[in-house]
Amino acid sequence: MQALSQLSYSPTAGANYRTRRALLQTCARLAVCVDIVLGPTLRLHCVFSDIIASRLSLFTTPLPTSASQLRDFPKRLAGRVILITGASGGLGSVLAMGCAAQGATVVLHGRVVRKLEALYDRILAADHPEPTILPLDLAIAKAEDFANVASALQSQHGRVDAIVHTAVLLGSLGPIEHQSFDSWLATLRVDLLAPFGLTRALLPLLRAAPDASMTFTLDTRGQEPKAFWGAYAVAKAGLSALLAILANEWENIATLRVNGVVPGPMRSPLRAQTHPGDDIRRLPSPDVFLPLYLYLISGQPKRESGAVIDGERWLRDAQPMNPPP
């Protein structure tokens, strides 16, 4: 049992998507057998449920362990076109600057033009490739809006090499009976329907790239839903399912990869909203996750797809985070 738990997070275990899926199916069957034979009182199947809930991360190459490993990415992203949703947010802006520093042309998506322009200026001031600004309110976006995004990127860049989903809307927290339909609709639009809509619209551009990747930013509340989290937890659960579906559908497409990261608690406006009494200064900065996202974007994982990386565990195993030289 313990060995299986360790295997589920092993960064060096060799397994492709089919092997991972077979392992999950075996665990699911075994979980049912354990529950039937031993009864619900022991609840041993919870060990397997934890694996089934998209927490399996079996990479054939080691994950980066510190920001100093950014030296291993010298302009690795040069010439690539990378769309980052929610680019003006805490995590999104870190990823935008990091990708631009590695030579990528970053498409900065956000809702507030002023914030996107400020990030645009920072990227240019650092002498990185000129980014593209993409203002779009995902809470009201429709299918034709995503089609227009695809058309504009096709005209301007010809392809999209990577999409990193960080845009998020918390919505309202509280008992279901006190949550409005409109709040749920807006949250589901931003957190679930928009990733689906963008993926669907941009798939031809991803296929035009020689090595395309998609990275979802997930949340433990989607894997372990609890009271009062409402539409946010439902949307994040749906996003985990979308990731698994895409990985399965793209299994035989060598140039397409999709993976996810569950960062865990970090210093962000979202955390300040959900835990207003906490001192978020004591939490990890979004910067510490940059090497992990760059690794997934860069193509270094090759055919690795369908994995979800537990950011908290990765941080515990990582070396001290020192800024790159």
Stretches found by the model and what they are:
Residues 61-64, 256, 260-261, 268, ...:
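C-terminal helical subdomain
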Residues 126-142:
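Rossmann-fold cofactor-recognition segment
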Residues 149, 174-176, 180-185:
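Substrate-binding pocket helix/loop in short-chain dehydrogenase/reductase
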Residues 207, 211-252:
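Catalytic loop of short-chain dehydrogenase/reductase
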